[in-house]
């Protein structure tokens, strides 16, 4: 059924995906690491949901790090070496694994990790999906709960809708002023209405298959703050209402998360503080490693430079202070005496990507004289 409210979309840009039922990979799997055993080599243990084989996989760590490894060894619950494990306990060994990593609550998966939504790819949220499978077993663990809600608010979801205007294809589009978006709702036990959102097309298909024949499935991709905005303080939402694993958030729980310090630091008003370097302070400075987080931030910085003609240069380095705290140092050359307003805008444009490294530092090109000896490569962005 439809909810009794309709959202106006006044010239807003939406990531729209219509009838894009991407091929379901039958061997999709997640495994949340429960422990680590050294049996001549490091083996990660946990319950597999789906089918894991000796293949290339992604390991998502709770500190935001992402590794791409190859499964070299699979041991089933009886202790036998095997080629695959389906929906069962397993021990997994990898080629070239770093024994010094903290593997607690790391997620092993062959589902694509997406640090940001991409309308040209099927939406995937493997970490929150894997955490959903294990919620009932770990909800009393504070570390698990903190990780669970962090991933919930940082994920992007498929929201099924019906629009008053017909569209073709998929991608990012600017909706016309009078476009109406009808939001679907489902009724839970006790007569509670909830907004259904989905982690991926596999979960959405479980619901769409229950719809009428020839039903035109229209979806938009929304972040957690977007979903909260749709609710406007009323009611709750349910993730994957028809499986593979569901989770309901009522309005009280949503309010508790939105008002938490962690959420406000991630999505609230950005605060820029002036830092004065201490005399004799030792820092490490170099180029950040090539990974999904760094690549996505670089892309945003280049786009920001292209959108502001007064910006002459943007570069990005990795800074590590004496305590081991990491930050990305964004170096700018701007034809404006009030550079702080740009810092805030740059931070807001990149903050949702900060997972492994959660801080951004800023310096003008003049202030960054200390970094010139390290800046061996062409700048990330230079105005033509």
Name these PLM-found stretches:
Residues 2-18, 111-384:
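An interfacial alpha-helical scaffold signature
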């Amino acid at each position: 059924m439809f909810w009794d409210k309709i959202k106006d979309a006044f010239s807003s840009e939406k990531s729209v995906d219509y009838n894009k039922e991407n091929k379901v990979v039958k061997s999709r799997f997640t495994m949340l690491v429960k422990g680590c055993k050294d049996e001549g080599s490091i083996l990660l243990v946990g319950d597999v949901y789906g089918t894991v084989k000796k293949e290339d996989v992604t390991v998502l760590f709770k500190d935001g790090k992402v590794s791409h490894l190859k499964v070299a060894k699979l041991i089933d619950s009886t202790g036998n070496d095997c080629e695959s494990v389906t929906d069962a306990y397993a021990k997994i060994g990898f080629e070239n694994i770093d024994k010094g990593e903290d593997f607690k609550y790391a997620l092993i998966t062959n589902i694509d990790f997406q640090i940001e939504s991409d309308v040209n790819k099927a939406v995937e949220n493997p970490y929150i999906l894997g955490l959903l499978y294990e919620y009932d077993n770990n909800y009393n663990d504070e570390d698990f709960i903190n990780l669970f809600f962090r991933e919930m608010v940082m994920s992007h979801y498929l929201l099924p809708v019906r629009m008053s205007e017909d569209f073709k294809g998929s991608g990012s589009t600017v909706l016309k002023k009078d476009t109406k978006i009808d939001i679907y709702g489902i009724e839970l036990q006790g007569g509670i209405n909830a907004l259904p959102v989905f982690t991926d097309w596999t979960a959405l298909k479980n619901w769409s298959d229950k719809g009428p024949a020839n039903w035109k499935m229209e979806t938009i991709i929304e972040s957690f703050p977007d979903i909260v905005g749709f609710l406007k303080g009323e009611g709750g939402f349910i993730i994957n209402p028809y499986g593979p694993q569901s989770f309901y958030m009522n309005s009280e729980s949503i309010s508790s998360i939105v008002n938490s310090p962690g959420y406000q630091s991630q999505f609230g008003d950005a605060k820029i503080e002036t830092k004065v370097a201490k005399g004799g302070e030792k820092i490490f400075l170099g180029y950040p490693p090539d990974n999904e987080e760094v690549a996505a931030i670089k892309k945003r910085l280049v786009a920001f430079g292209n959108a502001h003609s007064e910006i002459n240069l943007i570069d990005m380095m990795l800074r590590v202070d004496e305590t081991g705290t990491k930050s990305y140092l964004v170096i700018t050359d701007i034809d404006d005496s009030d550079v702080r307003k740009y810092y805030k805008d740059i931070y807001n444009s990149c903050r949702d990507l900060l997972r492994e490294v959660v801080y951004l530092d800023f310096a003008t090109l003049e202030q960054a004289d200390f970094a010139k000896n390290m800046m061996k490569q062409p700048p990330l962005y230079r105005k033509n």
